């Protein structure tokens, strides 16, 4: 008889936080440009080991409002916020990453910080 595969109980799983951000730049940016910039900012500010521990993951970006969501490990939220703040240029265009807020769920993040930008 086969046994059921073991899984981690919720108390042992990694806890994530979601960061809402706005990109203010000289021109509108595409999703792929922002995704690459977030990853490169994480690597340059935190290094390979820090990025591996922080586990940044690009969730969504709205090209119309230039706002997006990034997932990060709970213990490394401030480090990723710092990395995004240090990002000043994307493909030769000056840019500012403005953190709108941090939440434990995407639903609450959209309701609290991204509703004014047309997110549902």
UniProtKB/Swiss-Prot annotation:
Its main location: cytoplasm. InterPro entries: Pop5/Rpp14/Rnp2-like, Rnp2-like_sf, Rnp2_archaea. It is an enzyme of class 3 (hydrolase). It comes from the Archaea. Gene3D superfamilies: Ribonuclease P, Pop5 subunit (3.30.70.3250). It comes from Thermococcus kodakarensis (strain ATCC BAA-918 / JCM 12380 / KOD1). It catalyses: Endonucleolytic cleavage of RNA, removing 5'-extranucleotides from tRNA precursor. One of its GO terms (molecular function) is ribonuclease P activity. One of its GO terms (cellular component) is ribonuclease P complex. Belongs to the eukaryotic/archaeal RNase P protein component 2 family. Keywords: Cytoplasm, Endonuclease, Hydrolase, Nuclease, tRNA processing. Part of ribonuclease P, a protein complex that generates mature tRNA molecules by cleaving their 5'-ends. The keyword Transferase does not apply. Consists of a catalytic RNA component and at least 4-5 protein subunits. It is found in: Cytoplasm. The keyword Cytoplasm applies. One of its GO terms (biological process) is tRNA 5'-leader removal. This is Ribonuclease P protein component 2. Its EC number is 3.1.26.5. Signal peptide: none annotated.
């Amino acid at each position: 008889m086969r046994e059921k595969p073991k899984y981690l109980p919720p108390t042992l799983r990694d806890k994530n936080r979601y960061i809402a951000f706005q990109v203010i730049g000289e021109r509108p940016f595409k999703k792929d440009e922002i995704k690459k910039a977030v990853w490169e900012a994480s690597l340059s500010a935190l290094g390979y080991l820090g990025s591996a521990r922080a586990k940044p993951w690009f969730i969504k970006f709205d090209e119309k409002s230039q706002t997006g969501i990034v997932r990060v490990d709970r213990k490394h939220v401030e480090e990723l916020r710092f990395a995004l703040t240090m990002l000043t240029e994307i493909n030769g265009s000056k840019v500012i990453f403005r953190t709108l807020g941090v939440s434990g769920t995407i639903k609450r993040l959209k309701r609290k910080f991204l509703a004014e930008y047309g997110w549902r």
